Amino acid sequence: MTNLFQDDSLTLHTDLYQLNMMKAYFDDGLHERRSVFEVFFRDMPFDSGFVVFAGLERIIHYMQNLRFTETDIAYLHDELGFDGPFLEYLRNFKFKGNILAAKEGEFVFKTEPVLQVEASLAEAQLIETALLNIVNFQTLIATKAARIRSVIDDETFAEFGTRRAQEMDAAIWGTRAAYIGGCDSTSNVRAGKIFGIPVSGTMAHAMVQAYRDELEAFRSYAKTHFDSIFLVDTYDTLKSGVPNAIKVAKEMGDKINFIGIRLDSGDMAFLSKKARQMLDEAGFTEAKIFASSDLDEHTILSLKAQKAKIDSWGVGTKLITAYDQPALGAVYKMAAIADENDILQDSIKLSSNTEKVSTPGKKKVYRIITNEDGLKAEGDYIALADESLENVDKLTMFHPVHTYIMKTVENFTARELLVPIFQNGELVYDMPSLDEIKAYKEENLALLWDEYKRTVRPEQYPVDLSVKCWKNKMRNIEKVRKSVQLHSPVELDMPF
């Protein structure tokens, strides 16, 4: 059988058109021209009021191993027809650029850069696909997990989605993202080993079915597991499962730690109330009721509204697949490119869809934090790279489209969201531990007003442009429109 994975190179984890463009740049002598690209998304996933940035650790691993292997070169030559000096360039390829990004666990919002690449045109083009692949998936899962965490308060929350994930890599990295977003543990043993995430799990229906009866299965499980949670819905939750769990717990006494029971089907609100009553009457008032089965933040909110007696939640399919919105839609757009004198010139992408018009120029993003009612974020402020908010005492923030919507902020702190990750191709960022990332996410959560954290119809968090950045965008739009009109061979009557 052919070895499908001859090496562990991810460098060809890119779209063909990236290589096609690199070849054209190389042939025209443009491949070393300095450029700036930025990653952002246009819409808030799940109609959420916030998004949790994730994926940076995998980006770092990817960038540190970015090189074309001999098997890569052979494939590009034999199968795709690349040859000559271009292949030699790829053989000696090394990323020498700069990458800035939001920290993992940072709350980010639509239209603002969450990652910025400044590198040669060829370098920046090659890494687009992988960067978007990583950010789009992990940020989506971290956000979904954070939304689930927001509705269950301090109750425990386990990630149970491995078998429903879109393949093994998605399960592993999705688990990590879910942990950043708010889950307490995972059923995925490999993810526990790799990342140090606490692992949790009970039993499956198959174990109950494998024994003569449910009672025997529970007894067997209790003999081998001091911490016992019994799955009670294989046959009949209230007539069989819960009574048998209680019976085994009483039989075993101090020989086990009877943690509780798990419900995996049926009317969770009704069954949890009845099961709680039965456990309490049997003297197991401390026993917990765990729930699983196609849960998400909406189902959990509904169960809580029905006063379900559930203490812990196992969330699988709808978390690990981001079931209700399986794509974030982050894009990677050129913001600037150097001229013949290596001076960066603005670059803009226009569209008849106004939300798809990019904001030109190399930029920075500030989070504006005031001391009103404790530290609170007033909004994010996108400025051009040469702007600074040092020694600025009063800041006017206005909506970038509806410019009459504005406010003035005083006594604020401005924190830059994008921090250096790679400089001149070298890693300069100290990657925090996963628990530190998770704690950072919780710190950031406290900065948001409750109105932005609502699960349903949250208030829209302000993301504004500086006056200079806004004027620069308008100037570039007009410049491109005039250029198109001047050089277009076709005359069109535009509706605006």
Predicted regions and their residues:
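Buried, small/hydrophobic-residue-enriched core segments of structured protein domains
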Residues: 2-35, 43-45, 81, 87-96, ...
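Short coil/turn segments at secondary-structure boundaries
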Residues: 74-75, 143-147, 161, 453-460
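Short acidic, Pro/Gly- and aromatic-enriched capping/linker segments at domain boundaries
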Residues: 99-105, 412-417
